[in-house]
C-alpha cells in the first residue's frame, strides 16, 4: 500500500479526502500545520477527526514563528496588500507545503495530496510550491470529483454521511481559513456573489454594526 501525505485542515474538503484516498488504496498520513488563529482544543479536535476518518497517523506541526518571521514581517515592511485591500494571508500555504514535503521525506514517499478546488488560487500556491521542492506526485481529490459532479460540497457531504461520518452545519456551508494574519471565508452564498450572512463573520462584525465614532 502506497503512503500518501495529505495536508489536512479538518474542513469539509480535506475531511472528504481521507476516506476518498483510502478507497483509492492509499495509506493516508494527515498533517495539520498550525499557522495561528486556533486554540489547542481545536487542534486536538482536528487530530481526533483525522483518526475517526481513518487516517493511518496524524501529524501536527506549529509554524506560527516561521509565519511571523518569514512571511508576515516582510509583508508589513513592504506594505503589501492583496488587491490593495488585505494581507496575503493565504501565503501560509507555502509553509504548509514545506512541512508536508518534510513529512514525505520522513515517510519515504513522493505522494502528496491537498484539498484545493479547481476554482481558486490555492491550487496554484500548493502545486507550484510542491513542484519547486522536488519530484513529488500531486493527488487532488477535489479536482478529480469536480470533473464529474457540479455540486461538489453536497457530493462530499453525502459521501461522508454514507460512511457514517457526522458533518457540522458550518462545515457543510462554509470553508473557513484562519491564521495569524486574518480569515478568509468561502462557500454558500459567498460563491454566488451574494452578501454573506451575519454568522459568517469570525473576527469582526458587518460594517453596519460597527460602533459609531464619537467626535468631541
Q: How would you label these PLM feature ranges?
A:
Residues 1-214:
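Nucleotide-activated chemistry modules centered on ATP-dependent adenylation/adenylyltransferase
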